[in-house]
């Protein structure tokens, strides 16, 4: 009882890996057995087919051997026997018969007769059986390559081939003559503010310009919620413009606050995503040739490859500020507007009477940036530039200038057009109310001061950062067709290609001759050697 249980327990705890191995071995043996049986069946079928073909050939040969004497051979022998008998009978009729002589006279035999004439040509025999095909002869020798054939006629033009690979850029040609001056281009974009220059000498006070036209007054914006008065904070560092928040709900009307100071110009908005490129337009008809232009200026100004600088005109003078209007209610923060076009310079007014010398005026503000000079020579290659974020912060710091003092209040302007409602800005800290100052009397213009001394030359500034790529210029007029260039030199011979892959075995040739003729030095059979 215990032994049986132990045996059962031992059988139950068999290794599963050994069971899998045994099953795999059994499956392999079964596959080998099936493969062997299949191979035996195929070999047996092929052997039976070969045996049947051999038996059929032997039976056919036996039938031919048995039917030979009684059939074709008997007919052939019968015709020959009939021909021989007919010739013999004809010959017997033409021979002289032996004279009958008595038996007592024994004459010697006469001389032998002359040889008879050849007999007539016999009738053609029956056609024999068709012989079997001969065994294939040996392969013939390769013939020598033939002479090149005559040049063929000119073929029809073929289809356009595929576009070739782009060739290498040719050497730069000599500079062409200066072209005629182009038409005045559109006003360029407002450039970035350059670095602040050194303090120049105090210039003479200019004459007051005419009052500008009164600008249209905008509609009063919605009033925001009154903010909690906070302490006046220190001036913060100008940071990058944040993303505009979603437009909030309209607030309740608040109390009318005191007049605020002029706000700082908003930072420029982020660059929008590029639009989808438009489809290529159809090529228009070619216009008539234009009239010959006048002779252009032969002075060549090198703009260092910057075609936009060549098309840009000098910056116009700054227009006179208009009178300030009545302050309206504080509106919501609007979107940053596009930079406006510089106004035209107003006409110079009549010269006034010389006034009495007045007291020395306060130190004047920094003058406007002068016209851009001619481009200087290329400097040495600078070091690696800083990241774009630092450049953006620096450019924003240059754009955001300190606010000037508030101007005197002007007459109310007419109602302006409805502006685009911008996103609601964050509530700013409410500043303390300043004391209203008294308006002082206007001072008399002082005399023109003597010109200052020429300042010392400043140190050479560092090379500026590379500017952003300019806009594409307007396409110029189409040039005349150039002269045909000379034929280029013959290119070098290409590198020989790799050995090709061995071709497939050729098909068996036609049945050869029993004994091929010898071949001469030219690869052709020797003359006089021929076969039936």
UniProtKB/Swiss-Prot annotation:
Any coiled-coil regions, as ranges: none
Gene Ontology CC: one annotated term: plasma membrane
Topology, Cytoplasmic side: 1-23
InterPro entries per the UniProt record, alphabetical: Collagen, Collagen_Structural_Proteins
Residue ranges, Extracellular side: 46-532
Cell membrane recorded as keyword: yes
Keyword Protein biosynthesis on entry: no
Region called Disordered, residue ranges: 102-532
Keywords: Cell membrane, Collagen, Membrane, Repeat, Signal-anchor, Transmembrane, Transmembrane helix
Regions of compositional bias (Pro residues) in chain numbering: 174-184, 241-250, 314-326, 403-414
Residues of the Collagen-like domain: 108-163, 173-232, 242-297, 313-372, 404-452, 455-514
Bias (Basic and acidic residues): 342-354, 380-393, 427-441, 478-495
Membrane topology per record: Single-pass type II membrane protein
GO molecular function, one term: identical protein binding
Post-translational modification: Undergoes proteolytic cleavage by furin protease to yield a 60 kDa soluble form that forms a homotrimer and exhibits a low affinity interaction with heparin.
Protein name: Collagen alpha-1(XXIII) chain
Lineage of the organism: Eukaryota, Metazoa, Chordata, Craniata, Vertebrata
